[in-house]
Amino acid sequence: MFDKLQSIKERHLDLERMLADPAAAGDQTRFRRLNKEYSDLKEIVQAYDRYASARQQLEESRHMQKAEEDPEMKAMAREEMLELEERIPGLEQELRILLLPKDEADSRNVIMEIRAGTGGEEAALFAADLMRMYQRYAERQGWRCEVLDYNESSGPGGFREVTLTISGHDVYGTLKYESGVHRVQRVPETETQGRIHTSAASVAVLPEAEEVDVEIRRDDLRFDTYRSGGKGGQNVNKVETAVRITHEPTGLVAACQEERSQLQNKERAMKMLMAKLYDIKLQEQQQERADMRRTMVASGDRSAKIRTYNYPQSRVTDHRIGFTSHGLPHFMQGEIGELIDALKMHDQTERLQEAARA
């Protein structure tokens, strides 16, 4: 492991020198590739430096503890030595996690689909709540979040389905754990007897695809246009600017109505369709690994009930890892980072154990 870490550090220094060369900016494609590799290695190098520094301090403390004659200085050296011996295994574990193979899609932007499930109008309201939760989390992360398409429910404020695009650093790697069925328990505003109702909404997180990821034959596509309910200004409900694309071999559908022109909506819908087809490819790869890896955390099983939001008890529970928080109002305001970090750590621990067994 440490030979590999030393090689990574040397590569990081090489990249730093290459990026500092003014000529590097002449080829923007190469510059972006080098800059991404540099950024990807930076966290590993920083963790390795912390580990190496702690090891060096430990050796110095051991030497001082043996060589020092002053009892007080000897005791100080021993105290520092014990502290470092306790801290170093954690730093080593951090390095092992950082060296785990990365999911090639982790750095990509995502398309997120939220659909109301069982529960009628209450499920549609919950879908809208989830949308706002993710929008606020994206804002906290410094990501860009846009609504691509939506289908409002019959009642005010709800969505039968809504599609978002979220762009930024490591978006898929962070949000991929959100795929699945989210269940809510609360008293609807229309409930006169105070009874708690259970509703559900499903979330699908798809990594944005690039043209090289999927091959689409134009003959396999059907394009339909319709009147938009989006932000088309004077065109709204007058011109058919909204676009729906159907991939006939699979039956997959992607639609966009939020842009001002038909061409822009067509481009956005095409991106959504590519993401859906790429997701099928990823799901097939994950299924191939399913026999070796039983954890549901990153399986992306869309039918799995992953989380319950209990409003009367102000509690949110993630059933995959047994995580419980009693700060539901803050959670719904987008403060979901603690849970996402716990899911990441659980996933990484599972992968470390899998690597140790291999």
UniProtKB/Swiss-Prot annotation:
UniProt entry tagged with the keyword rRNA-binding: no
Pfam annotation, one family: RF-1
SUPFAM superfamilies xrefs: Release factor
One Gene Ontology MF term: translation release factor activity, codon specific
Keywords: Cytoplasm, Methylation, Protein biosynthesis
Localization terms from the record: Cytoplasm
PTM description: Methylated by PrmC. Methylation increases the termination efficiency of RF1.
Cytoplasm is among the record's keywords: yes
InterPro entries: PCRF (IPR005139), Pep_chain_release_fac_I (IPR000352), Pep_chain_release_fac_I_sf (IPR045853), Prokaryotic/Mito_RF (IPR050057), RF-1 (IPR004373)
Gene Ontology CC terms, in alphabetical order: cytoplasm
Modified positions (N5-methylglutamine) in chain numbering: 234
Function text: Peptide chain release factor 1 directs the termination of translation in response to the peptide chain termination codons UAG and UAA.
UniProt family annotation: Belongs to the prokaryotic/mitochondrial release factor family.
PANTHER family, per the entry: LD18447P
Protein name per UniProt: Peptide chain release factor 1
Organism of this sequence: Chlorobium luteolum (strain DSM 273 / BCRC 81028 / 2530)
